[in-house]
Amino acid sequence: MGEAVTANEGLSAALSATVDSEAREFIRLQLRAFNDLHSEYHRAIRSVEPTPLDILIRNAAGEIVGGLIASTYWGWLEVNILWVAEGLRRLGHGRTLLRMAEAEARTRGCAHVMLTTYSFQARGFYEKKGYRVVGEMAGYPPGVVYYWMRKDL
């Protein structure tokens, strides 16, 4: 680890198992500049942060027993997390969270929703709500399938 490998034209590549924060930030900014040059949407998102869209379900004691964490940008709703407490599952709370998020996304001008789920999570639930698989990666982690899903609003 960390040993330089000589390449053509006087360049070298070095592998490291330690974080070089300055180098990582430089590389991130270089890719951002490239993206901004080629995509008006990437440029636009830099001027406005994605708008959070969070919905919480609380019990009578005020404890969180379910929720959806998402954001809207580029005309999309991105659902990052949807969770309902074990004893409250299969009672329609997940459906309510999705419906509320989709309705708010429409008011924000969104036309699509995207989310990810694992094979041990909720693919069937999302499919029943009109979502479809647009990509999958088997073996991530081993023995599991990771799905990308979308829905047009």
Predicted regions and their residues:
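Conserved N-terminal entry element of GNAT/NAT acetyltransferase domains
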Residues: M1-S21
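Conserved catalytic-core motifs of GNAT/GCN5-like acyltransferases
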Residues: M114-T116, R132-R150
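A conserved beta-turn-beta hairpin within the catalytic core of GNAT-like acetyltransferases
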Residues: S71-N80, R89, P141-V145
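A conserved beta-strand-loop-helix scaffold within acyl/acetyltransferase catalytic domains
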Residues: R46, N59-A60, V65-W76
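Conserved active-site tyrosine of GNAT-family acetyltransferases
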Residues: I27, Y126, Y131
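Conserved acetyl-CoA-binding loop-helix of GNAT-fold acetyltransferases
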Residues: R90-A103, K128
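Conserved GNAT acetyl-CoA-binding A-motif
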Residues: A105-S119
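Active-site rim helix/loop that mediates acceptor-substrate recognition in acyltransferases
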Residues: R28-A61
